[in-house]
Amino acid sequence: TSDIPANILIMLDTSGSMNDKLYSSVQVYYPLDVATDSAGNVYVMEYYNNRIKVFDSSGAYLRSFGGYGNGCNQWQYARQFIIYNDVIYIADTYGRKVKSITLTGQCKDIWSTSQYPHAIAANSNYVFVGHPSNSISVLDHRLNQRSTESISSNYLSYAWGMSINSAGNRLAIADYNKNQVVEFSISGTSLSYTQRTNSSYSSSNGYYRRPTDTGYDSSGNIYALDLYNHRIQKKNSSLAYQTKTGS
């Protein structure tokens, strides 16, 4: 032990191995979702730490906030969050809530539910919340519930992640159970089924093995995170396969 200098913390597990890490402010632990604000800052949600870390566009650490709990700026293993008009909306999955907070983590509004919200997206009028079921809750931006859209189980089973196009009139949902991406048109608080991808569990191009999130580009193409195929697939606005990255 005489070779070990003072003022150094060494972390050992119960077997005596040095397997644990000290996580600094610039590291992220189990990042699950990411979003940007109007200034280009990047917000990263750490799943197990129940925390959001903020970095500037060059990757420099700025701040962090959150924590496990029931407080309005705490959550319990949230699955998805978004930033819309520089307000953060969080699907607090095991807290059974949707929460809105400022870009510095200050409280705004809370909506409570008996379900376990997983997916969240917003347009200029409403916030859409997906659950591990075939229903979508529609809230206003102050998180007052406006409607619940019950979708036929033929089209939707488990909304894990979702996004809305730039026009605010299309909603793309990653359906975890059905291994598909399904798209709906938006009219006010109403959703109408439009189209969906193949729903077989497969590693072939155009198919998914547990999709967990979606995103639109400015041309209306849809990108979906294909979890167990370890890739992102791109479909055009008609949901025809275009390309992929990852394997």
Task: Show the residue positions of the predicted features.
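Acidic, polar low-complexity linker/tail segments
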Residues: T1-S25
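Beta-strand-rich domains and repeat architectures in extracellular enzymes and scaffolds
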Residues: V26-S38, V42-V44
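Gly/Pro-rich loop segments of beta-rich domains
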Residues: V26-Y30, A60-R79, G105-H118, N144-W160, ...
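Residue-level detector of Asp-centered blade-edge/turn motifs that repeat once per structural unit
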Residues: T36-S38, I83-D86, A122-N125, I164-G168, ...
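Conserved beta-propeller blade signature
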Residues: N41-Y43, V87-I90, Y126-V129, R170-A172, ...
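Structural recognition of the beta-propeller blade-terminating site
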Residues: E46, D56, D92, I101-T102, ...
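Short loop/turn segments immediately following the C-termini of beta-strands
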Residues: Y47, T93, P132, Y176, ...
